[in-house]
Structures are given as C-alpha cells and as structure tokens.
Amino acid sequence: MSGTNNVAQARKLVEQLRIEAGIERIKVSKASSDLMGYCEQHARNDPLLVGVPASENPFKDKKPCIIL
C-alpha cells in the first residue's frame, strides 16, 4: 500500500515540478522596478493614498447621532 502511495506522490511532485519549470522567470530587480513604476503611475487613483471625498463616501454618517 505505502509503496503505491509513495509512487503516486512522487508522480504528483514530478508533475508539479515540470509545471513550475515551465514558468517564465524574471529577476527580482526587474519585477520590483516594474511594480514601483506601476504604483507611481496609479497612485493618484488609489483611494487609500489620496482619500475618498466626503460627498462620495458611502460609509460616512449622513446625520450625527441623536443620543449624544
């Protein structure tokens, strides 16, 4: 039982390694510079960086709490 189980696991591992070997790779320095460029180009549209105008914020309370 364990022999056939080990063979099946080894086949799955080999298949996964073949898939990963076929993936195109780029250097980290290239990927990081591309990512930084993308972030800089899209920063003005990012609501986490520039904020959401109060008039467009659906989560802002429309009225203050009456209890307080």
Swiss-Prot record:
UniProt modified residues of type Cysteine methyl ester: C65
One Pfam family this sequence matches = G-gamma
In terms of InterPro entries, this protein maps to: G-protein_gamma-like_dom, GGL_sf, Gprotein-gamma
What is the gene called?
Answer: Gng7
| Positions of the propeptide removed during maturation | 66-68
Q: Topology with regard to the membrane?
A: Lipid-anchor
Q: Where mainly found?
A: membrane
Q: What is this protein called?
A: Guanine nucleotide-binding protein G(I)/G(S)/G(O) subunit gamma-7
